[in-house]
């Protein structure tokens, strides 16, 4: 069994995988000021709550888009499990062909998503990861990473409206009864949810047109389960895509005995 951790700007996903299957998955808030001990305590809590046996863990891997947390979490894993995790970055074997202007700029989370997508779903492929930012990655028929799009995440858009307007309230991410809102709360809900779904549909259609094909579309990340069902395109939901990708990368890079 391996420990897999993905550090995002808003949340950290902690999970264990065995034989390519996700055993458990937990989500905690990213805190750049947390100490090694605090993150080690979070790991212990995740294992305890899922009754997972730490003695069964024989490896660990993490990806991160928050450099301030990467080393802290690495040390926390070592403190709790007495293992040094692999860190997704330069030197890690991915098998991914990256066709963008500067491959070094591609975020580790997008690399991990792509590795998992290629392994589990038909190509060509569009991967939508709905986190702090919503990222759209495009994989061609040969599994090459062609590029993508970045747009504000649903929560970021919501926070910007609430903080920069005098009278628009915070709302829950739940569907209004009607698309056409008749009060501020329902108008916001409709705009945020259906607006983001419409944006994704538009990007999917444009990508398909540019590639002159119909891509498999996979969605993952915090609000994907809310937005994807509202899209008119067929979208596969996979909440464990990142953990699956980390598991694959661990197998590609684990130390040989």
Regions found by a protein language model. Give the residues of each.
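Short, aromatic/basic amphipathic alpha-helical patches
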Residues: 72-79, 229-232
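Phosphate-binding/catalytic loop of phosphoryl-transfer enzymes
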Residues: 75, 83-87, 92, 96-164, ...
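ATP-binding/phosphotransfer module of carbohydrate and carboxylate kinases, centering on a glycine-rich
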Residues: 2-4, 30, 157-257
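Short glycine-aspartate micro-motif
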Residues: 2-6, 61, 125-129, 218
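Short glycine-rich, Thr/Ser-proximal phosphate-binding strand/loop in the N-terminal lobe
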Residues: 2-45, 142-169, 174-175
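Phosphate/pyrophosphate-binding loops at sites that engage ATP/ADP/AMP, CoA/4′-phosphopantetheine
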Residues: 43-59, 80, 203-215
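N-terminal low-complexity or amphipathic/hydrophobic leaders
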Residues: 61-71
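Short, well-ordered alpha-helical microsegments
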Residues: 69-71, 135, 227
């Amino acid at each position: 069994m391996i420990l897999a951790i993905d550090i995002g700007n808003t949340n950290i996903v902690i999970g264990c995988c065995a034989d390519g299957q996700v055993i458990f998955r937990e989500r905690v808030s990213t805190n750049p000021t947390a100490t090694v001990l605090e993150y080690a305590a979070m790991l212990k809590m995740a294992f305890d709550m899922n009754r997972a046996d730490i003695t069964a863990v024989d490896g660990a891997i993490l990806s991160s888009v928050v450099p301030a947390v990467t080393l802290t979490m690495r040390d926390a894993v070592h403190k709790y499990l007495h293992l040094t995790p692999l860190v997704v970055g330069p030197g890690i074997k991915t098998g991914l062909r990256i066709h963008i202007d500067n491959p070094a700029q591609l975020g580790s989370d997008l690399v991990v998503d792509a590795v998992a997508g290629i392994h589990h779903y038909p190509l060509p492929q569009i991967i939508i990861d709905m986190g702090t930012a919503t990222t759209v990655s495009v994989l061609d028929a040969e599994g090459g990473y062609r590029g993508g799009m970045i747009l504000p995440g649903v929560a970021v858009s919501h926070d910007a409206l609430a903080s920069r307007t005098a009278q628009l309230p915070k709302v829950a991410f739940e569907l209004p009864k009607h698309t056409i809102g008749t009060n501020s709360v329902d108008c916001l809900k409709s705009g945020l949810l259906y607006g983001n779904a419409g944006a994704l549909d538009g990007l999917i259609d444009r990508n398909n047109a540019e590639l002159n094909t119909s891509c498999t579309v996979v969605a993952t990340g915090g609000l994907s389960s809310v937005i994807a069902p509202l899209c008119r395109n067929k979208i596969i939901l996979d909440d464990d895509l990142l953990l699956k990708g980390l598991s694959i990368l661990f197998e590609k890079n684990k130390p040989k005995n």
